[in-house]
Amino acid sequence: MNGSYQAPAWMNPYVSGQAVGYSQAVMAYADYYGVDGSADMEPEIDERISMVPCPMVSYASRTGTRRNLEAMRAANWRLLVSAKGVLRTEGMRYALDNGAWTAFQQGEAFDQRAFGRAVDLLGENADWIVLPDIVAGGMASLEFSLRWLDRLKGIPTKLLLAVQNGMQPDDVRELLSPAIGIFVGGDTEWKLGTMNTWGLLARRRNCHLHVGRVNSARRITLCAAAGVNSIDGTSATRFAKTLPPLDAALRHAYGQQDLFNPSSMALQQVRFDCRG
């Protein structure tokens, strides 16, 4: 890796227990009600509250045009800020991408310094942060992500583990919780073919499920049916005129969620092997 990483100073109070952030609070709440993910592996634990599906949240890559930005703001979409991009939020809610995909497209190695700078500036108030991964790296990517998970131990922000071609639910199962979720990457065929599996696993572990590069109404519908919590895409970023139909598809998909959506199922209804 290029350069050494030092956690930002703002993390210190959370690590020492002097401050309580989202991750610490949600895990305390989840533990009390038995929905911290441990019931997945320990059947004797009862979940003492029911899971209720929430509207799927949409993020779009940062845009440089005011028209596109205002269209996103009006539709209550959020920004997905890349660590390799411009580190501005434009006053909108946002999540932080690790920049690995951008670096991959540019033929570059993962930029540790850029990621560290982004976490320092924006990490504390992000909805979530994608842990660094290796594009098309398979299990080597997971090992890389786990090193970063250890480095960011104590962070108050929700973290997402990137899963991709070749990974199985049991590879990440025991890592997941309301504070550590899933980012579904990989190529399009693999992503669409395994989305329901990750939705079932997310329900069993009660963790956040995000799917990347969702740029059509059909894929939005598929994501909603799989119990996905959030999506991102670039279509709305590039063209303000494409945002209304995508947003309409998002709202329609939420309104049409059926009983097979895993996020609304009781734990006993979801198979441990995550096959639907």
Residues covered by each model-derived region:
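Non-catalytic, usually N-terminal nucleic-acid engagement modules in DNA/RNA processing proteins
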Residues: 1-148, 252, 259, 270-276
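Short beta-strand/loop segments at the ligand-binding rim of alpha/beta enzyme cores
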Residues: 51-54, 153-160, 201-212
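Conserved, mostly hydrophobic/aromatic
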Residues: 97, 161, 223
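Catalytic cores of alpha/beta
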Residues: 110, 171-174, 215-230
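Distinct, well-ordered alpha-helical segments
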Residues: 140-147, 167-177, 194-198
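Glycine-rich beta-to-alpha transition loops that act as phosphate-gripper elements at the mouths
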Residues: 163-166, 208-218
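Glycine-rich phosphate-binding active-site loops on the catalytic face of alpha/beta enzymes
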Residues: 186-188, 224-250
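C-terminal helical cap(s) of enzyme catalytic domains, especially alpha/beta-barrels
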Residues: 238-276
